[in-house]
Amino acid sequence: MPADKKQRKGAHPYRKPRPNPSDPSSSDKPARPKPTHRIPATEARDGAGIPGLSKLKSSIRQTKRLLAKENLEPGLRVSTQRRLTSLEADLAAAERREVERKNGAKYHKVKFFERQKLVRLIKRFKRKLLDSETSSKKRSKHEEELLDARIMLNYVLHYPNTQKYISLFPSNPNQTEDEDDDDDSSKPKLKLPPLLHPVPSTEECEKMDKPTKRRYDLLLETKRLMEESKLKSEPETDLKKGQVDGVVVGLGADVQIGLGDKKEAKQNAAQGTGEEEDDFFESGDE
């Protein structure tokens, strides 16, 4: 006798029912917790709240297409023109931020090693000044070297990330970072680069190439800012507090120090992602 249709549709008496995914109580395993946060889009991951380059360029194109219409209402045209001006300003800020990000990542290692060298030199000069047997002539020399080392440390800490970094130390593979002050040591000791003293003459300044001249101008500008108390006179103390590279203390991150031509500074910021040779490799050795 054939089985009843209702009995066929019912559950098998010896088969365990399958859990219903819509009913969490029907499953033996604990339900996976749902994520409580959403990953924001790439354009929204900016601390300044500025969208990404692609989104800004797309918005500018759409705004220009809207302004190209002839039958646009006067009020809407004015508001659209204002929006275009705001978008172009945001695009310039985003491009600048991208240049700063790339240069910061590119020269981070170079700045780190030069910062470590300068901190070692500062400790060495401090130790020599504490020596009571040091003569007055040597003491004045050590004070001068200590000041120059601090100027160079501020140079490294506050170098604008919109520009290509110009190295302070020559790329000498045989030079060590040994702090030993023994003059009889066979290994070459770490020495402070003679970039500020002796002071170069006018003829020597005229013979400098462009990267060397720009580095010297930046060092003089850094010294002036230290004299005006806009930069720390003892920058080595800020390293313990997590000093951020590329930030000009007291003036803001948009200040271009040591550059006389503003147009050249804007071109350097706009062309920061170009493929020209880096100034670091042009003037690494002196």
From Swiss-Prot:
Location of this chain's protein in the cell: Nucleus, Nucleolus
Acidic residues composition-biased segments: 274-286
This protein's record includes keyword Lipid biosynthesis: no
GO biological process terms, semicolon-separated: maturation of SSU-rRNA from tricistronic rRNA transcript (SSU-rRNA, 5.8S rRNA, LSU-rRNA)
Source domain of life: Eukaryota
Residue ranges of the region described as Disordered: 1-57, 167-213, 259-286
Family: Belongs to the EFG1 family.
Biased composition (Basic and acidic residues): 204-213
Annotated protein name in UniProt: rRNA-processing protein EFG1
Function: Involved in rRNA processing.
PANTHER family: RRNA-PROCESSING PROTEIN EFG1 (PTHR33911:SF1)
Pfam families: Efg1
Record keyword Nucleus present: yes
Organism: Cryptococcus neoformans var. neoformans serotype D (strain B-3501A) (Filobasidiella neoformans)
One GO term describing the cellular component: preribosome, small subunit precursor
Classification of source organism: Eukaryota, Fungi, Dikarya, Basidiomycota, Agaricomycotina
Comp. bias regions, Basic residues: 1-18
Stored InterPro entries: Efg1, EFG1_rRNA-proc
Chain's gene name: EFG1
Recorded coiled-coil stretches: 53-103
